[in-house]
Every structure is written in structure tokens, then in C-alpha cells.
Amino acid sequence: MINKKSKIKVKKMNHSVKIILRMGVYQLLYLDRVADYGVIDEAVKMMKKIDRRSSGFVNAILRNISREKDSILDLDDSYKNLAIKYSYEDWIVDRISDQYGKERTSNILAALSIRPRIFLRINRNKLRDGENLSDLKKYIVDRLEKDGVIVRDRHILEEAIEVENFKQIENKDLFKSGYISVQDISSMMVARALNPKKNSKVLDLCAAPGGKSCHIGEMMKDSGSVLACDVFDHKIKLIKAYSNRLGLTNIEACINNAMVLNEDYVGAFDYVVCDVPCSGMGIVRRKPEIKYKKKEDVDSLPKIQRKILDNAAKYIKKDGVLIYSTCTIFKEENIELIEEFLKDNKEFKLESIENLPFERERLDKGYLEIIPDRDDMDGFFICRMKKI
């Protein structure tokens, strides 16, 4: 949008000019609590405090956009205009259009622009003798509501609670004492798809900050072992702090490079989880900066993902289960990569996913594509494979 109205392209603008213009344009087009003149005036004042010389430029661009606001908002949803309307790099919109069709692309981008909901995960490890999860959930909901939190239980997963008006969670007693954790509903699906048996040996190769590992530990009722790995020491500390807060004793965090084969892990685990580094194109509403990723950076990811998956395959016992997951909707990081992996590794086969609230025909394929426009949650890909 800014590029259309400015002779100086965004990439060449001073960083502060770019940020102020983006904020101003968003307010002009999509917010209505402040009149246009007020938005422009505040943007110019802000710019003067940083760089007085650029204030006239900011004023001119924003006034130009304000004058043409109605025609801009009336842009049709042809894919050529979607990059402007939703503020994406052109190549991202083109790729979504190629993979999901031009008509659906607008719906996907709109869904990725909706304010994300907040979900809490209940710690099953807090169940007392004779108590079921419904009892624990009621106890937590009652305490949340007494604290002024709005609770919306949509019954997607029994251990999940949707909340509003929940601020400074780290200071809440329920959080500090390990009853709840913040985790998006799509992310919770990974441990659910794994569905580990009690006393199993589990490896989480890309575990930080620890949400999925701890969810797995909770599902096994603090039995067995979950080895949660990451390549950075500061992330290992995050995992340890997470599991300690929840009171889990079956989580062990250690440094390990998922890109390098670890001979000590070969054939040692009942379950392995690969929640690999990805483009994040399913969680744009949580991390809007993803809209501006460079094509070459995203195109380099499948090679990294495949290397991690190949190593993970070697760590599983016979009849063990391998979970591959991402938080992207790009097919080259998801099903296309899995198809290539299965072609090269005949000892693995897709296995029907249980324990998830989706139509049977979607789960029987052995992989689940969660797309924001259809499923009303963050975009995710989860694949379950068995070693035969």
C-alpha cells in the first residue's frame, strides 16, 4: 500500500519512517476510534520527535491514503490485490494462491488477520485421587471467574480453556502453582496426536520452550520419560523452568543439535516428536512480522526439516511412532516433504490419528492439515507415522 503511494520504496525507507507509516496506514484503513485527521496529526508529531525532516513526507503519504481510503477499502479480492489489502509480500500470496486456489486465498488471509484467542492447558498432574478432569476444570474455571477472567469453554479439547481479559498470567497463583499453562489449541493437538502410553520413552527433538514436552509428560501422568532437546542452553533453562513449575518429574531437558545424528539415541525411543523450525505461515496473527519473510529464507527450510526428520527416524524403536509437525500451511514444508520421506523410508507408514476432534476421514489419512479459514484456529500440520 505504501509502495503504491510513495516514490521511495519501503525497503529503502528509514526504519522509523517505515514503522510510523505502517501504523498510520493500519489505523486509517482498519480502525475507527480516531478520526483520520487525528491519526495523521499523531503520526506527524511522532515523526518530528525522531526526525523532523521526514515529518512532511509522512504527512503527505498519509493524507494521500486518507483521501483515497474508500477506493482502497473497495479493492476486490483478486489475488493481485490481496498482498496490498492484507500487507503481505507478493510471493507469499502467490504461493498460497497456487496451493489453495485464488478464491480460498482471501479467506485464509482474512482468517490469519483475526485477533488470536488465548487458550489455557489444564495440568492433569494436579488431579487428586477420585477426581476427574471435569472436576479439576470446574475448580480452575471458578477461580478464574472470581479473578475477573472471562472463560469461554468451547469443548474442543477437554484439557483446554479459552479465556479473555487474562492479564499478567505469570503473577497468577493458578499459573505459579502449575495448574495452568498458556498454549494455543492447535499446538495442543501435537501431544494429542502422539497419544503416548504410560511409562513410554519419548524424545522431543525441537522442544523449546517446552509446552509440547510438558503436555506429553502430563498425558503420561508423570510416568516414563520425556527427553526434551534444544540446541541452545538458554532454551534448556526455559524447558526446565516450565516442567518444574508444573511439578513434572518425567521431563529431562538437554542440549542436542537435531541436525546432527546422535548415536546414543539410535533405536532408543518409543515415540519421537519433530516440531521442526518452519516458516510460521499458520501463526501470522500471533507474529505479524512473518508477513515480510524473504522467499529465499523460507525456501531453505525444507532441507533443514528433512535433515531433522531423517535423524529422528533413526531414533525410533520398531513399532514406535514418529510425529512430524509444523505451524505453517505451506505444503512444501508439510505433506510434500512427508511424501518424499515415505518414498525414501519404506519402513515407515502413515497411521490413523486418534484422540483429536476432527472428522474421521481427515484423521484416517495419517496427517492433519489445520487451515485457519476452515478450522478457526492457528494453521498447523501434524503427521503420525509408525515404524514397521
Explain the meaning of each model-derived region.
Residues 1-388:
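S-adenosylmethionine
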